[in-house]
Amino acid sequence: MIDSATLTYAPFVDSRGKHNPDFTTGQSGKLLIGTDANGKKYLIKHCYPHNAANEFVGCWLAKKLDIPAPNAFLLSPNKAFQSRFAVAIEFLDLKPFDKKAVSHPDDLIAQFVLAALIAQEDRIQLKVVDNHIVSFDFSESFCISKLDLILGLIRQHTSFAQDCAVGILRQQLSAFQKSLTRVKFNHPAFAQAYNLDCEEMCKTATAISKRVLRIAENEIRFMSEELEKLFPMEISVYYEECIFAMQEHIKSFQ
C-alpha cells in the first residue's frame, strides 16, 4: 500500500475527449493523476470500491502469470478521493496497438487469457509499451458488484447483516465459478482477426493459463493481506476463493 499523503493530485484529462465533444468518462468515474516526490506518475481510481480491488488483484495476477500489465498499489484513504477505496495504477508511456502488425503474438494471446480468467466485462484495451502488448482497465472483473452494499452490511456489525453480506458474496463467487466453465481458447474468429494460427493460439493460451497453478498459497495470502489493509476480511477471502477456483478449473485443462 502507498501512503496517499506522499502523492500530489491533479485531474486526469483523457486525450480521447479533446477532439470529441460527445466523449464521456467511463464507469470508473472521474480519475486523478498522482505524482510522487520522484516524479513517478500513477492513474488514480477512487470513486468505487470494486474498482480499487479489481485493479489491484487483476494487475497482481497478471504479474504472477508473466503477462505484461502495469503495477497497481492500494492507497490509504485521502480527502481527495470520492471513496475510502482507491488504487494507484502505474502510468505507462502507452503507444497505439496495431492488430495488423502483432510483433509479440504471445503477449496478445496472454491478454486474451487474462481477460477470460478474470471474467473481464469491459472490452479488452490493448496498447504497446517497450514493444510488448499490455492490457489495462480491470475495473469490471471477477463478477463482483454491489460492493458498496456489501461493505455497508459488514459495517453494521450485526449477525443478520454479516449473513446477508456473506450470502451476496457467495452468489457472486458462484457466478465467477460459472464464468470459468465458459473459458475456452479455440476461437477461430479471434485467430483470424489477428492473423494467428488457431491451433497454435489454443496451445499457447492453454500453456499460459496453466501458470495459475504456479501461484503458491502463501503468495495468494500475501495478496489477501494487502487487500485487508483497506478492505474487510470478507472481501479478501472472496478474491482468494476466485484464485483457488481458477486453479481448480485449470487443472482440468489438457
At which residue positions do the language-model features occur?
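Generic low-polarity alpha-helical segments
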Residues: I2, K63, V87-L92, I124, ...
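Conserved ATP-binding subdomain of kinase catalytic cores across diverse folds
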Residues: D3-P96, Q111-E121
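Short acidic, gly/pro-rich beta-turn/loop elements at beta-sheet edges
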Residues: I44, A72, K99, K146, ...
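Conserved aromatic-histidine-acidic binding/catalytic patches
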Residues: H46-H50, A101-P105, F160-A161, F231
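Short, low-complexity, polar/charged sequence segments that are solvent-exposed and flexible
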Residues: K63-L65, P105-L108, L153-H157
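Low-complexity, flexible helical/coil segments
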Residues: K79-F81, R123-L126, L169-F176
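Conserved kinase catalytic-core segment
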Residues: K95-L149
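C-terminal catalytic region of ATP-dependent kinase domains
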Residues: H132-Q254
